[in-house]
Design a protein with these regions (language model features):
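Flexible, solvent-exposed loop/hinge segments and secondary-structure transition points
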Residues: 1-139
């Protein structure tokens, strides 16, 4: 008997589940956010802007998702590594399109493989992070 092969790419259906879970969590918290899902190469796969979310969150959600996918780390962790005196100091300046604060999570198998990333923006960094974690957990 063959074991099913693991998916090596992020499907639109998977991305839509992430978006739905993020929206549900944002609504539960009574927040309006933007949610972006990118593939392993950081290309946008799905995006939603909830009613009343701030316009600045559009770009930030995508940047957080991109950061998580490209570095296979939560964007907040990348931020800690990018601080003064840290190994990735000023990575945002040398590698454009990143956001090095909480709200982005890699999608995949717990560090084994990265299928993409989800990014949430529009609330506090901690709230964005909790919504992104809900998206990953339900995806």
């Amino acid at each position: 008997m063959r074991t099913p092969a693991m998916s090596t790419h992020l499907s639109l259906q998977h991305a839509q589940r992430c978006i739905a879970a993020a929206i549900a969590e944002a609504q539960r918290q009574r927040l309006a956010v933007c949610v972006a899902v990118v593939d392993a190469h950081a290309n946008l796969l799905a995006f939603v802007r909830m009613d009343d979310s701030v316009p600045g969150a559009i770009d930030l959600a995508q940047r957080k998702a991109r950061s998580a996918a490209l570095f296979r780390l939560p964007s907040g962790e990348l931020g800690r590594l990018a601080g003064p005196g840290q190994p990735l100091w000023s990575i945002e300046q040398s590698n454009g399109g990143l956001a090095c604060f909480a709200g982005g999570m890699p999608l995949g198998d717990a560090g084994v493989s990265c299928l993409g990333g989800v990014g949430v923006s529009g609330a506090s960094a901690a709230q964005d992070q909790s919504i992104a974690e809900a998206a990953v957990a339900m995806a």
